[in-house]
Amino acid sequence: MAPDPWFSTYDSTCQIAQEIAEKIQERNQCERRGEKTPKLTLTIRTLLKNLKVKIDLLKDLLLRAVSTRQITQLEGDRRQNLLDDLVTRERLLLASFKNEGAEPDLIRSSLMSEEAKRGTPNPWLCEEPEETRGLGFDEIRQQQQKIIQEQDAGLDALSSIISRQKQMGQEIGNELDEQNEIIDDLANLVENTDEKLRTEARRVTLVDRKSTSCGMIMVILLLLVAIVVVAVWPTN
């Protein structure tokens, strides 16, 4: 399996930084002895330029790996920490290079850190999680893609649930609208029925009055007939 290009570049960059630190130390020792160092100075300048190019390449590779989800966010953060250390070391080496005739503690600390990292090309692997321990780069990428697919499936399921809940809410709203329409129809029916009852009540009252008037007229007519009969009835 082909090695990870990012770590291959990282290892070579660390070697360049180590070489620069050693060359600066050698130059400073020569200058303390009164020796001229134009060749060493030129070599250090060239190595510093190469170091900057390598660091820029590491930045591009890391950005591409994170943006295309070839690595997890945790792995990206770890690589970014390593890259930040390299950038800091580059600045320290450049400052030490410009400080001619001096050998600051920065050079010695850089040498010690590089010695400590020898034999451990990928120092962050000691903190590698159990899920990816022993897996190759392609296997880790497949595992990450599987995790992303599972997350996408979970988001799709959540979206489906939200859609169903929204649809249920719309159906409940429609049912409430229908019930409100039924209640409005019942209210109109009750109002119309009440109006009809009032109309019929007025009619009954009118009929009752008419009935009372007709009864009185009949009584009066009967009385008149009785009077006439009594008047014309012969008496002895």
Swiss-Prot record:
Post-translational modification as stated in the protein's UniProt record: Ubiquitinated by HECTD3.
A GO molecular-function descriptor: ubiquitin protein ligase binding
TM spans (from-to): 216-232
Statement: the UniProt record of this protein carries the keyword Secreted: no
Vesicular topological intervals: 233-236
Membrane topology: Single-pass type IV membrane protein
SMART domains linked: t_SNARE
Coiled-coil stretches: 42-65
Alphabetically ordered keywords of this record: Coiled coil, Membrane, Phosphoprotein, Transmembrane, Transmembrane helix, Transport, Ubl conjugation
UniProt-listed GO biological process terms: cellular response to type II interferon; early endosome to late endosome transport; regulation of protein localization to plasma membrane
Localization of this protein: Membrane
PROSITE patterns in alphabetical order: T_SNARE
Top-level taxon of origin: Eukaryota
Domain t-SNARE coiled-coil homology residue range list: 145-207
A GO term from the CC aspect: perinuclear region of cytoplasm
Topological region Cytoplasmic: 1-215
Record-listed Phosphoserine modification sites: 160
A family per Pfam: SNARE
InterPro entries: Syntaxin, Syntaxin-8_SNARE, T_SNARE_dom
Subunit and interaction comment: Forms a SNARE complex with STX7, VTI1B and VAMP8 which functions in the homotypic fusion of late endosomes. Part of the SNARE core complex containing STX7, VAMP8 and VTI1B. Interacts with VAMP8. Interacts with HECTD3. Interacts with TPC1.
PANTHER family assigned: SYNTAXIN, SYNTAXIN-8
Family, per entry: Belongs to the syntaxin family.
Protein's name in the database: Syntaxin-8
